[in-house]
Amino acid sequence: MDANERKALISRYRDGHRAIVKALEGLREEELDRSASDEWTPRMIAHHLADSEMTSAIRLRRLVAEDGPVISGYDEAQFAKKLTTDRPIEPSLEAMRWARESTAQILERLTEEDWLRAGTHSERGPYSVEDWLTIYANHGHDHAKQIERSRGRS
């Protein structure tokens, strides 16, 4: 991956929060708990993104700061099932926003050597900083599309 590709992915990563906020815009409280078919509800997605952002932010920091870290997976479905219920989504959206902004600032300052750093993901195997960026650059946008489906927009 070259510097221009990384820059584009960092921009997309940073934009993920905006995409989520736009997808949620205008939803009434009761609509936060409706989903398209068997997908997560918008409320579950908002809370999942906060959990995911906090987890992924630490993963990236470990990849950059530690030599060959083991990056632990977690059971996203259980987090969604047990931790989302009826909580307001605003704190989770703020957690997502701040975790992404802080992490984007780190990404923008990585050296070529930093981009080559890697560890081992407990579920995926070899896991590099570039792998991390490729996954999380699209994560918010993918869930924004899921919210749009719950609204019947796609």
What is the role of each PLM region?
Residues N4-R12, R34, E66-P69, L83-R87, ...:
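Solvent-exposed interaction patches of small proteins and small membrane subunits
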Residues D2-E29, D51-I58, R62, I135-N138:
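Alpha-helical bundle segments that constitute or directly flank the non-heme di-iron/ferroxidase center
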Residues R12, G16, A23, A80-R117, ...:
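Acidic/histidine-rich alpha-helical segments that form the ligand environment
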Residues D2-A8, A19, L27-R28, Y74-D75, ...:
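General structural signal for secondary-structure boundaries
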Residues E31-A77, A104, E112-S154:
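Short, contiguous alpha-helical
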Residues A3-R14, E39-A46, I89-L93, E130-L133:
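Amphipathic, non-membrane alpha-helical segments in soluble helical-bundle scaffolds
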